[in-house]
Regions:
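A conserved beta-strand element that flanks and buttresses the S-adenosyl-L-methionine
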Residues: 13
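Class I (Rossmann-like) S-adenosyl-L-methionine-dependent methyltransferase catalytic domain
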Residues: 1-7, 21-103
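Conserved acidic residues
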Residues: 10
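Short catalytic micro-motifs in class I SAM-dependent methyltransferases
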Residues: 16-20
């Protein structure tokens, strides 16, 4: 991404982009999100699917809450985490909503 975009955003909304990124490249997703947000900015993510083993391939690539914590807690602060109660039926119980803040 162009340097002029670095630090220009208060919020990034994640919805089904992360699950399309190969697990071997998710560190790049983390890096780009970090670059785009200004200090205090928020990455608001609805991460999916939590119940799909990586061995099944993708996309969508599976992810666990533990993996999300491992990736993002290195640089971010987790402000909130919840399981959505009003998901559509095919995704109910298979996604997590997380609010990550850039210090």
């Amino acid at each position: 991404l162009p340097d002029e975009l670095h630090g220009q955003f208060d919020y990034l909304l994640e919805y089904i982009c992360f699950c399309a990124v190969s697990p071997s490249r998710r560190f790049e997703y983390d890096r780009v999100a970090w670059q785009l947000l200004r200090s205090g900015g928020m990455l608001l993510g609805l991460f999916f699917p939590l119940d799909k083993p990586l061995a099944e391939g993708g996309p969508p690539w599976g992810v666990t809450i533990s993996e999300l914590h491992q990736l993002f807690s290195l640089h971010w602060h987790l402000d909130r985490e919840e399981t959505p109660v009003d998901s559509i039926d095919p995704r109910r119980g298979r996604e997590v909503l997380q609010y990550w803040r850039k210090p």
